[in-house]
Amino acid sequence: DVCDSLVEGRCIHNGCWCDEEAPHGNCCDTAGCTAWWWCPGTKWD
């Protein structure tokens, strides 16, 4: 798959990821910007 970005060596396929410790308040997009909403469908390789 073509990855939008990498976080800790893992691919982001939907353009954002969430910290498992704070899934509703600590999301980031591929630009590294903090987003204050849940990112549904986050998929890691």
UniProtKB/Swiss-Prot annotation:
Annotated Gene Ontology cellular component terms: extracellular region
Main subcellular location: secreted
Residues modified as 6'-bromotryptophan: 17, 37-38, 44
Localisation per UniProt entry: Secreted
Disulphide bond pairs: 3-16, 11-28, 18-33, 27-39
Keyword Nucleus annotated: no
Molecular functions per Gene Ontology: ion channel regulator activity; toxin activity
Record-listed 4-carboxyglutamate modification sites: 21
Tissue specificity comment: Expressed by the venom duct.
PTM annotation (4-hydroxyproline): residues: 23, 40
Keyword Manganese listed: no
Keywords associated with the record: Bromination, Disulfide bond, Gamma-carboxyglutamic acid, Hydroxylation, Ion channel impairing toxin, Neurotoxin, Secreted, Toxin
Record remark on domains: The cysteine framework is XII (C-C-C-C-CC-C-C).
Purpose of the protein: Mu-conotoxins block voltage-gated sodium channels. This toxin reversibly blocks voltage-gated sodium channel in cephalopods, with no alteration in the voltage dependence of sodium conductance or on the kinetics of inactivation.
Name assigned to this protein: Mu-conotoxin-like Cal 12.1.1d
